[in-house]
Amino acid sequence: MSRSLKKGPYINVKLEKKVLAMNESGKKAVVKTWARASMISPDFVGHTIAVHNGNKFIPVFVTENMVGHKLGEFSPTRTFRGHAGNKKK
């Protein structure tokens, strides 16, 4: 189920403030965040955001194609080790 359009997108307030402050100053520092549910806004383009996956922070460089998606989509939480294969004797 998608979010209601009348509510608007969820963007973490602290994350948005940090990115807007970096846009004004012209800095390009990595911003750490635990807000995986936060929507990527056009202000985030060109910045690197380190998204927590439950174990460590995964750096995500935001491009124009990512706008509208959520940050958690780009930092996988599970590692796929492959299906069980035939045992070789």
From Swiss-Prot:
UniProt keyword list: Ribonucleoprotein, Ribosomal protein, RNA-binding, rRNA-binding
Highest taxon of the source?
Answer: Bacteria
**SUPFAM superfamilies reported in the protein's UniProt record:** Ribosomal protein S19
Decide whether keyword rRNA-binding is in the record.
yes
Kindly list the GO molecular function terms attached to this UniProt entry.
rRNA binding; structural constituent of ribosome
One GO cellular component term of this record is:
small ribosomal subunit
Pfam families in the cross-refs: Ribosomal_S19
- Annotated GO biological process: ribosomal small subunit assembly; translation
Q: Which family does it belong to?
A: Belongs to the universal ribosomal protein uS19 family.
Function in brief: Protein S19 forms a complex with S13 that binds strongly to the 16S ribosomal RNA.
**The protein, known as:** Small ribosomal subunit protein uS19
